Swiss-Prot record:
GO molecular function: copper ion binding
Name assigned to this protein: PF03932 family protein CutC
Family: Belongs to the CutC family.
GO CC terms: cytoplasm
Length: 247
């Protein structure tokens, strides 16, 4: 059985590294430190030009929960259309109602826009904050998504193994379960063997020092605990290590 490896990235350097490491698909985001937000149109367009493998854009207009207002929804619709215009192959989204159920009317609306633009759809980890994952599985099957990205309702996919295995059974081949969050070369094979998933999702994250010669530590561009002179990047060796381990 061939296992698909999806790598989430938030910069073009990481895109090159993910491809070099053997990724099968890219989840394109901005701000992975916030869980992944919508990438810019320029980022989408350049990724489409570079990548020989499918690229799916995250459609998440802000950090926080998955309950969106009309302005958020309008932005999401425009971003789905932008993904098509940029030349990408798919999008990734997830929307909930205030009670934690899948927002089916909105999901169906976004799904139609994606389908009309010939874009594949992954339903993302909003399912990990839903009220009833078994009901959500049926909702997502009804929508016609290709897959669900999930940690099995846990902090990481390894801790969610039992729920992931149940999700695979409930999906019953109607769509794929994409196991993600904390997947590494050390645990990927066990996650696959114990759950039956055919796809895994990881960042293979590492860092590199800035190439700046002038370093002004006293000036911060964001949160005080972030070092602006350390650049987060995907490590191609970590992706390859996972690929070799799960052969």
């Amino acid at each position: 059985m061939s296992i698909q490896i999806e790598v989430c990235i938030d910069n073009l350097e990481s895109l090159h590294n993910a491809i070099a490491g053997g990724a099968d698909r890219i989840e394109l985001c901005s701000s992975l430190a916030l869980g992944g937000l919508t990438p810019s149109f320029g980022f989408m367009k350049k990724a489409a030009e570079i990548s020989p493998i499918p690229v799916y854009a995250m459609i998440r207009p802000r950090q926080g929960d998955f309950l969106y207002d009309n302005d958020d929804i309008s932005a999401m619709i425009s971003d789905i259309q932008a993904a098509k215009l940029a030349g990408l192959q798919g999008v990734v989204f997830g929307v909930l109602k205030a009670n934690g159920d899948i927002d089916m009317p909105l999901s169906a609306r976004l799904m139609k826009i994606a389908n009309d633009n010939d874009l594949g759809v992954t339903f993302h980890r909003a399912i990990d904050q839903c009220s009833n994952y078994k009901k959500a599985i049926e909702n997502i099957a009804e929508l016609g998504c290709e897959r669900i990205l999930t940690s099995g309702l846990a902090a990481n996919a390894y801790d969610g193994i039992n729920v992931l295995a149940d999700m695979v059974k409930l999906a019953n081949g109607r769509f794929d379960i994409l196991a993600g969050a904390g997947v590494t070369a050390e645990n990927a094979k066990e996650i696959i063997e114990k759950t039956g998933v055919k796809e895994i999702h990881l960042s293979g994250k590492s860092t590199r020092p800035s190439k700046m010669k002038l370093v002004l530590d006293g000036v911060k561009m964001g949160a005080g605990d972030l070092d602006d002179f350390i650049v987060p990047v995907t490590d191609s060796k970590k992706i390859d290590a996972v690929k070799q381990r799960i052969k």
